């Protein structure tokens, strides 16, 4: 992993393919704020998820070890600090961070991830899901052992991660044009 951190966002997306290998990351937490699911997409490895006891520093470092940039939505405020507390990892210090929430704000856009997905036609199988419902699904899985809630939670997390790729492309196009669409 590379030392350093992205501080400013002005012009970031004009640089094309920047900072080597990217990892797109999203986490889900339980009611107490403990990480229960991690979803990551990076080339060439593709998509991987960890949940339950497999959420650990070794697994995360194994996937992110070559990443130079971690792409998230609100990751600078939520995902990365939460992983730092839960797994004792300093991902902000180890990789560049591209938080698409900050990018969309710099473009004058409003709304959260799901609202932006709707605005720009990014589809979801898990439409209507949100972070609170994700917590409830995890609790149902833990208390009942039923796989249905876990499968839905994992699908929701996967869509959060994979939709970051398309959202980044859209924001990059907007940044290159110099105006919000």
Q: Each PLM stretch: what is its role?
A:
Residues 26-30, 41, 74-76, 101:
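Anionic group-transfer/hydrolysis microenvironments
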């Amino acid at each position: 992993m590379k030392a350093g951190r992205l501080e400013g966002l002005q012009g970031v997306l004009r640089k094309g393919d920047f900072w080597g290998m990217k990892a797109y990351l999203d986490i889900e937490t339980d009611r107490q704020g403990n990480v229960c699911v991690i979803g990551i997409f990076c080339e060439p490895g593709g998509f991987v998820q960890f949940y339950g006891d497999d959420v650990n520093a070794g697994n995360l470092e194994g996937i992110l070890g070559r990443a130079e940039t971690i792409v998230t939505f609100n990751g600078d405020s939520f995902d990365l600090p939460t992983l730092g507390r839960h797994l004792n990892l300093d991902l902000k210090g180890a990789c560049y961070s591209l938080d698409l929430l900050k990018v969309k704000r710099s473009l004058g856009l409003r709304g959260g991830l799901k609202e932006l997905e709707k605005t720009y036609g990014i589809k979801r199988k898990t439409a209507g899901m949100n972070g609170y419902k994700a917590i409830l699904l995890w609790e149902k899985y833990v208390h009942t052992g039923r796989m249905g809630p876990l499968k839905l939670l994992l699908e929701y997390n996967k869509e959060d991660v994979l939709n970051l790729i398309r959202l980044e492309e859209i924001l990059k196009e907007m940044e290159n044009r110099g105006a919000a669409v």
